[in-house]
Amino acid sequence: MAFEFRLPDIGEGIHEGEIVKWFVKAGDTIEEDDVLAEVQNDKSVVEIPSPVSGTVEEVMVEEGTVAVVGDVIVKIDAPDAEDMQFKGHDDDSSSKEEPAKEEAPAEQAPVATQTEEVDENRTVKAMPSVRKYAREKGVNIKAVSGSGKNGRITKEDVDAYLNGGAPTASNESADSATNEEVAETPAAPAAVSLEGDFPETTEKIPAMRRAIAKAMVNSKHTAPHVTLMDEIDVQALWDHRKKFKEIAAEQGTKLTFLPYVVKALVSALKKYPALNTSFNEEAGEIVHKHYWNIGIAADTDRGLLVPVVKHADRKSIFQISDEINELAVKARDGKLTADEMKGATCTISNIGSAGGQWFTPVINHPEVAILGIGRIAQKPIVKDGEIVAAPVLALSLSFDHRQIDGATGQNAMNHIKRLLNNPELLLMEG
């Protein structure tokens, strides 16, 4: 038998991933630790190395397909490794042995399942923790129907099984489900006649788009958003960047306006610490964060990513500029790691790079605030009693009204405006 390599648990609480790219094909000879594939989990791309040396027999999952942790994704001819077990691959034989060691009382549901016909060849999709939970409860997990995505079994399914609900994943139930689907399909052809006038195509929702959608819905459903919009004369900031742009270039740094905004935001978070918290309503707690990590929303071909500048308060403008540029390149190339996209305490979203001005940015939950920056545009302003043209920056600050009051939000906005209006203050107060 070939060694069946299953999608491992790659951490971050992610139970599935999209196979973005295969680096091997049937017949390839591989060594241990060679990269087999790239898997998109949540918002990061993770390289999956081979745990064994051998010859690839068959790639089981095509590119663009979502696989669940524990699914066989590739078969490798590696005779010395056939019996090896890896994280995300539970040995189902243990689920048969352990329940036998425990004699459950006659009234408990598991005893009833002993007499039920269970397909032992059935493929089970379940996390290792769920398999362990089933064994502890004395349940043969192959007898449980999965209600999760792609039929994945959850702890709730095990509990339902114990309580007598949806007891088995029998062939009869599968057949009835299939019959129901077949019965419903005749309605579909009715839309075919409209194809000539109103053509439509469909595609699977990519893993990243699903992750973005889930995060946006969760944020808007959880946090009551309030957005403040303002603008600021940034002539001094413009001149300051122009003055140091060449010096930065000599050091290999591409200086933009964004690092200035990062430093101004960090200063505001320190002055108004309510913006640097998380509001945990379920636990009845407010989490105060004594570190300042700034997320930078980045637009890529695959969707929105938010790499994080860690400990931004300890870094110079040049250092922040370099880090933002490096993270942006990684984001575009799909090389960001999960660690590079977690831990933000507040986020900046730059719609100005796309030519926008004011907008209502969505909070990157569980953060409680997000600063949106628009484009810098020449506008008429009143200065010393005269109307003059000046570069003006649009700012939008969204915050969670459960934690931040309107006055606090506006005071934080005013502080940011003050620093960007006079960037030398960043050295004194930032």
Curated annotation (Swiss-Prot):
It comes from the Bacteria. One of its GO terms (molecular function) is dihydrolipoyllysine-residue acetyltransferase activity. Its EC number is 2.3.1.12. Binds 1 lipoyl cofactor covalently. SUPFAM superfamilies: CoA-dependent acyltransferases, Peripheral subunit-binding domain of 2-oxo acid dehydrogenase complex, Single hybrid motif. Residues 2-77 form the Lipoyl-binding domain. Residues 80-122, 164-200 are annotated as: Disordered. Belongs to the 2-oxoacid dehydrogenase family. Forms a 24-polypeptide structural core with octahedral symmetry. This is Dihydrolipoyllysine-residue acetyltransferase component of pyruvate dehydrogenase complex. It comes from Staphylococcus aureus. The lineage of its organism: Bacteria, Bacillati, Bacillota, Bacilli, Bacillales. The gene is pdhC.
